[in-house]
Amino acid sequence: MFIEKFKVESPNVKYTEDEIHSVYNYETTELVHENKNGSYQWTVKPKTVQYEFKTDIHVPKLGVMLVGWGGNNGSTLTGGVIANREGISWATKDKVQQANYFGSLTQASSIRVGSFNGEEIYAPFKSLLPMVNPDDIVFGGWDISDMNLADAMARAKVFDFDLQKQLRPYMESMVPLPGIYDPDFIAANQDSRANNVIKGTKKEQVQQIIKDIREFKEKNKVDKVVVLWTANTERYSNIVVGLNDTMENLLAAVEKDESEISPSTLYALACIYENIPFINGSPQNTFVPGLVDLAIKRNSLIGGDDFKSGQTKMKSVLVDFLVGAGIKPTSIVSYNHLGNNDGMNLSAPQTFRSKEISKSNVVDDMVSSNGILYEPGEHPDHVVVIKYVPYVGDSKRAMDEYTSEIFMGGKNTIVLHNTCEDSLLAAPIILDLVLLAELSTRIQLKGEAEGKFHSFHPVATILSYLTKAPLVPPGTPVVNALSKQRAMLENILRACVGLAPENNMILEYK
């Protein structure tokens, strides 16, 4: 059975006009390596830690500014939200299609809330806590191309033509602000698009981005702004001692107009100055150590890296299944070809390397979790190939071969062919990222030993489910297994309304 909404009644949760206050008993374990009777052994000690959560229930008017607004992802997301808001339908070769938010975790997935008369009861994910309605988002942003969003949508060739015709009147007046352009960080083939750029030194560029954010917020009368990078993949920045390794060195490098500070880092820096959430949707190392230090010091939310939408999402499920089943993946070969501007930019070796790193590290935590299958330091052979084929456009093809060792020296091979409609998969993920980032800023918590409430750590691990290479605070384990990431996100939101984690034990029927 599916229900639209619910309210929790419990001694551990209290609803007021302004907030939801919950008390949550976090059950975990403590491991001790100790000497007992002359030999060392591991001891696992269950423990319970009490947390309190406060969630502000006042949903703000939200503005979303996209870096690369005129790209395929930006035009697809903007058009998709307009289509939903206006209730647009259009003819395809198969049927009359209604606008929807399929592919969005927050808008189109469900959670189990219990059982009733022997039947499982589910509710929308978005019913857990008050969230921004995507139809109410105000969009803006920057692009190095001055093409309006209607023409950008036509250039992208993602939407059906009938839908494009209906969206055009809404999108013709949407023109991106000039963006930061540094040809050293992206492929040379992007130069022909760069007719809308911010001039000046890096310090002046940061100041202009800050000015743009403030003017957007004032003009549109929004309460909050989230900024997200969905522009070209950049090459990796060199981490240099004395340049970007500390907060002080990074800020000094911007003052000196050092060439190795990337555009994405400059956007993030501007957002941190304004205490506005910044999310990196591409694989480059935007968050150099000095930038992370600054975000932590100023308690400004940052998240990333790289949207997890197609091939990598499948990989984080399949390898988790294989290793969890006691099967040993020994070779993973991933081949992609695509024909959109992302593919053209990735045809340059230096930008492809950023994507290769992002895609290759996704199985690390799953491999290291099983010392029966893998010796220390052992890892599957893992190869990632991306080729640019203009004809296929946004319809990316992903082909994977997984070779594994099975019982008694046998070999098992799984081959997948995945046609990933690149921007149609990425757009709802962008939506989830900005909605969850905004929600995160309204949640505070404290442990039983803490005197006052505080926000989540500014390095937003809560967004990990949506990213290929999750950004985590220093010293925090990286989790890539998709099921664990979703469980973490759902269970944190459940804790905010006093609900226990979903453990699937269903003891009442045993």
Curated annotation (Swiss-Prot):
GO terms for cellular component: cytosol; nucleus. NAD(+) binds at residues 70-73, 143, 180, 190, 193, 230-233, 281-282, 306, 309, 340-342, 355, 393-394, 422-423. Signal peptide: none annotated. SUPFAM superfamilies: Glyceraldehyde-3-phosphate dehydrogenase-like, C-terminal domain (SSF55347), NAD(P)-binding Rossmann-fold domains (SSF51735). It is an enzyme of class 5 (isomerase). PANTHER family: MYO-INOSITOL-1 PHOSPHATE SYNTHASE (PTHR11510). This is Inositol-3-phosphate synthase 1. It comes from Populus euphratica (Euphrates poplar). The lineage of its organism: Eukaryota, Viridiplantae, Streptophyta, Embryophyta, Tracheophyta.
